[in-house]
Amino acid sequence: MIPGEILTDDGEHVLNAGRATLTLVVANTGDRPVQVGSHYHFFEVNDALSFDRAAARGFRLNIAAGTAVRFEPGQTRTVELVALAGDRAVYGFQGKVMGPL
């Protein structure tokens, strides 16, 4: 075994199966790239990203853990979000929630 190695069963693995998802169109209106990590509360991302922010409350990017999506200046792209799990409480980030969703 290699440190950090993950051994899985053969076959296809579905991430976030059975969880609510949401598709949004996101535009970077700023003059600098914005990168958003896999577990960042999307409602609280950089204000230069323009999208239906209220709809994104309680969601994160539906991508593999440890990865990110980069939005270049002026770029518009469609992303899929997945509902946060666990206690559904959010603390930190930009401090816009600081408690249960």
UniProtKB/Swiss-Prot annotation:
Keywords assigned: Cytoplasm, Hydrolase
Keyword Cytoplasm: yes
Pfam families documented for this protein: Urease_beta
GO biological process: urea catabolic process
Compartments reported by the entry: Cytoplasm
GO CC annotations, alphabetized: urease complex
Reactions that this protein is recorded to catalyse: urea + 2 H2O + H(+) = hydrogencarbonate + 2 NH4(+)
Keyword rRNA-binding in annotation: no
Subunit architecture: Heterotrimer of UreA (gamma), UreB (beta) and UreC (alpha) subunits. Three heterotrimers associate to form the active enzyme.
UniProt cross-references to NCBIfam families, sorted A to Z: PRK13203.1, urease_beta
Similarity comment: family membership: Belongs to the urease beta subunit family.
UniProt name for this protein: Urease subunit beta
Annotated source species: Burkholderia lata (strain ATCC 17760 / DSM 23089 / LMG 22485 / NCIMB 9086 / R18194 / 383)
Recorded name of the encoding gene: ureB
